[in-house]
Amino acid sequence: MSFRKVVRQSKFRHVFGQPVKNDQCYEDIRVSRVTWDSTFCAVNPKFLAVIVEASGGGAFLVLPLSKTGRIDKAYPTVCGHTGPVLDIDWCPHNDEVIASGSEDCTVMVWQIPENGLTSPLTEPVVVLEGHTKRVGIIAWHPTARNVLLSAGCDNVVLIWNVGTAEELYRLDSLHPDLIYNVSWNHNGSLFCSACKDKSVRIIDPRRGTLVAEREKAHEGARPMRAIFLADGKVFTTGFSRMSERQLALWDPENLEEPMALQELDSSNGALLPFYDPDTSVVYVCGKGDSSIRYFEITEEPPYIHFLNTFTSKEPQRGMGSMPKRGLEVSKCEIARFYKLHERKCEPIVMTVPRKSDLFQDDLYPDTAGPEAALEAEEWVSGRDADPILISLREAYVPSKQRDLKISRRNVLSDSRPAMAPGSSHLGAPASTTTAADATPSGSLARAGEAGKLEEVMQELRALRALVKEQGDRICRLEEQLGRMENGDA
């Protein structure tokens, strides 16, 4: 067996995480202490939102991404709820609209000013009332404008048309116990849910029917999570009967057995999965952990491939994930997380090391853009549509530090080169020959440059030969290793 086949090839094997410098963090934020397994954080290309401690009700902070450093205690908040805020979610089709769910049993939708808050925001644009217990889950539809899902501790899932404040669908008989989380599929035709009864369900919200169900997806009693992947499979996190944390991958067509099941460790914190459909990488963050593990999902067994772990010193109380269109593609950034500490928010950048300054097509396929593919009425009528994709190539900015600059200015003359007679036709390259270039000194200068160039070329040829020699040697060693493993040597 060749060693090349033993080590799985992946362009994400060398992804590494890097926290930003202290002056790029958001300091002195009083992160909420409410007991709820939410991310407590939501981010988009314009704003960072964090659920914070508030007296006399619930509040969350909305900061422009550029508002780093220490945040003044008097900085205005969004503070219209009468009970603690449990979950927040930015609208995928409008970077200035955010929804929140609260212990006061309401869902509120807020319009954030273009440049951020200058005074406390107490009046939502829409109040959605329909739950009888606290609302802990908020999820916008991925492709239909103004469609919002909410789930409460009354075990009810409601689908809303935010534009009309109308309750579109009420699903009140599908969950016998507390709902831990919900996740829309790629086009928003279905959603999956994880429930306290240990079941994972796939639900058609417009029909109000159960499409598939897996009882005891994870046998442990602690909270679990379920998310849809782009190809329709379901990824879950949970606990075993012995309280070991687990990951699993399921095929909705056959939920009898998981396609893959992995055990991680014996920590207590719930595992929060963040999925990137463009790269098929799942990032798993444990509440109370100080690490982020990431895995690549493939179509071949064993399906879930561990890539690496980012580890820091401080435990995380929550986590937000930047949408792909908010990343710095010129730095080969494939993910950015916003880690909540006790009193600050720290961005963590995930990067694929690349030597080339060119746009990396393989890292950045077309991704979901901010334009809705459907109106709410179209979705209600039964239509489905995939997200409208955009290219990130326009966001690419070449690194100025690596630009090659060549100057041929003559050190013997500050005068501009004279144009040769008859050489001024449109579009022709301007001549850079000067009178000084024709002198013996100019000839020597050019000869010196040519000599240096030849030295560089010789060194480059030698390096290429060395690389080829090393490559051949590696191949020979791999063949020897393969023969030894097969018992031939």
Swiss-Prot record:
InterPro entries attached to this UniProt entry: Coronin (IPR015505), DUF1899 (IPR015048), WD40/YVTN_repeat-like_dom_sf (IPR015943), WD40_repeat_CS (IPR019775), WD40_repeat_dom_sf (IPR036322), WD40_rpt (IPR001680)
Modified residues (Phosphoserine): S2
Keywords, comma-separated and alphabetical: Actin-binding, Coiled coil, Cytoplasm, Cytoskeleton, Phosphoprotein, Repeat, WD repeat
UniProt cross-references to Pfam families, sorted A to Z: DUF1899, WD40, WD40_4
Entry superkingdom: Eukaryota
Residue ranges, compositional bias (Low complexity): 428-441
Coiled coil: 449-474
Subcellular location: Cytoplasm, Cytoskeleton; Cytoplasm, Cytoskeleton, Stress fiber
BP GO terms, sorted: actin cytoskeleton organization; actin filament branching; actin filament bundle assembly; actin filament organization; cell migration; cellular response to platelet-derived growth factor stimulus; endothelial cell chemotaxis; negative regulation of Arp2/3 complex-mediated actin nucleation
WD repeats: 18-72, 73-122, 123-166, 167-210, 211-256, 257-296
Disordered: region residues: 408-444
Gene Ontology MF annotations: actin filament binding; Arp2/3 complex binding; cadherin binding; identical protein binding
GO cellular component: actin filament; cell leading edge; cell periphery; cytoplasm; cytosol; extracellular exosome; focal adhesion; glutamatergic synapse
Modification comment: Phosphorylation by PKC on Ser-2 regulates the interaction with the Arp2/3 complex and cell motility in fibroblasts. Phosphorylation does not seem to affect subcellular location.
Impact reported for S2D: Weaker interaction with the Arp2/3 complex. Does not affect homo-oligomerization. Attenuated PMA-induced ruffling and slower speed in fibroblasts
Family per similarity comment: Belongs to the WD repeat coronin family.
Protein task: Regulates leading edge dynamics and cell motility in fibroblasts. May be involved in cytokinesis and signal transduction.
Description of how the protein assembles with itself and partners: Forms homooligomers, but does not form complexes with the other coronins. Interacts with Arp2/3 complex components, including ACTR2, ARPC1B and ARPC2. Binds actin.
Protein name from the UniProt record: Coronin-1B
Origin species: Homo sapiens (Human)
Source lineage: Eukaryota, Metazoa, Chordata, Craniata, Vertebrata
